[in-house]
Amino acid sequence: MGTTRVCSEVSSGSSKSLSQSLTVSTSTTETVNGFHEFKICGYSLAKGVGVGKYVASDTFMVGGYSWAIYFYPDGKSPEDNSSYVSLFIALASEGADVRALFELTLVDQSGNGKHKVHSHFGRALDSGPYTLKYRGSMWGYKRFFRRSSLESSDYLKENSLLVRCRVGVVKSVTEGPRYYNIPVPVSNLGQQLGNLLESGKGCDVVFQVDGETFNAHKLVLATRSPVFNAQLFGPLGDRNTKCITIEDMEAPIFKVLLHFIYWDELPDMQELIGTDSTLASTLVAQHLLAAADRYALERLKAICESKLCEGVAINTVATTLALAEQHHCLQLKAVCLKFVALPENLKAVMQTDGFDYLKESCPSLLTELLQYVARLSEHSVIVSGHRKEIFADGCDASGRRVKPRLH
């Protein structure tokens, strides 16, 4: 990190004139840091794929750029094949002269904390950040670890390795003088509408839900939900309606729905369901997603999708997948398909009650799932090495400059 002050004299003259014309700006250079963990399962099966062939992590974002970790079980270059494994970080998105610091850590899985760390961060003052010139440029080590030592070490556990990566992208910002600053309070519109709901003032419609009643305001409902707008003020609606019965929804779910309509945020879910159980939270999110789709509350639907994505698990993924299909949640559906199709998950998911429900409610998804499993098998993360070897400086083995692409 570094800070540079630049002072400029706008005019010359007396000392009084000089003091009045002096302006100051500050340039701050710092790193935007990010971390990624990459677990390599089935190490013994990855061996023997050939020199220059690698196992690739999923891409991850740091500092506005996409990155990936490449592990070469048989070495990156022919001269390293017999003795070493290779490990690199690659720029996976378009970018010119991306300056960054890197750190690669092979985690000691015995719990003793004796990790193998190769870090560029500690050497930054000596050599400065490393510059990646274009997509596919790499930083790392051809001779990261001697293979014989690795295979008899605590870094290899249950035939798997764990790599932790740290990337620090260098960013510079220049700021000029600030002559004034007037703080602006954050919006409290949601709180005001929520207080209106809780007070009961002006309520003009009552909902009957699963034996419970809820008061609300027609204009607020119609403003927030196109479905309520059509029901209350549309050509087929009844503007004089005073009571509406909601079928096929539990009262706690409708209460959360109503809270979101007024507050534009979810209540404390742990307080609502009385537990911090992940399973209970997932079930509530599933019901709430269906309710959000029913009343066209797109932001609430997206929030539920996000929570279900974060909590995807063996015992709930099948029902979540069915829900995503029924309510047209394409991103959530893709996440669930990817999770179920993983070899270590597929058998366990098929033994759940949720999978039986999936087969009954969405039989067409089984075909999609089989196709997804087949695609994963065809496009293994172990990439065939029929392309030329590309080095960090952007040259191939013959020394000609190339523009590498990641696949």
Curated annotation (Swiss-Prot):
Induction and repression of expression: By drought.
GO CC annotation, single: nucleus
Biological process, per Gene Ontology: cellular response to salt stress; cellular response to water deprivation; protein ubiquitination; response to osmotic stress
Tissue and organ expression note: Ubiquitous.
InterPro entries linked to this entry: BACK_BPM_SPOP (IPR056423), BPM1-6 (IPR045005), BPM_C (IPR034090), BTB/POZ_dom (IPR000210), MATH/TRAF_dom (IPR002083), SKP1/BTB/POZ_sf (IPR011333), TRAF-like (IPR008974)
GO MF annotation: an example: identical protein binding
Top-level taxon in the UniProt lineage: Eukaryota
Subcellular location: Nucleus
Residue ranges constituting the BTB domain according to the UniProt record: 203-270
Pathway given in the UniProt record: Protein modification; protein ubiquitination
Assigned keywords, A-Z: Nucleus, Ubl conjugation pathway
Domain MATH per the UniProt entry, residue ranges: 33-167
Stated family: Belongs to the Tdpoz family.
Role this protein plays: May act as a substrate-specific adapter of an E3 ubiquitin-protein ligase complex (CUL3-RBX1-BTB) which mediates the ubiquitination and subsequent proteasomal degradation of target proteins.
Subunit structure comment from the entry: Homodimer or heterodimer with BPM3, BPM5 and BPM6. Interacts with CUL3A and CUL3B. Interacts with RAP2-4 and RAP2-13. Binds to MYB56 at the promoter of FLOWERING LOCUS T (FT).
This protein's domain notes: The BTB/POZ domain mediates the interaction with some component of ubiquitin ligase complexes.
Protein name (Swiss-Prot/TrEMBL): BTB/POZ and MATH domain-containing protein 1
Organism: Arabidopsis thaliana
Top-level taxonomy: Eukaryota, Viridiplantae, Streptophyta, Embryophyta, Tracheophyta
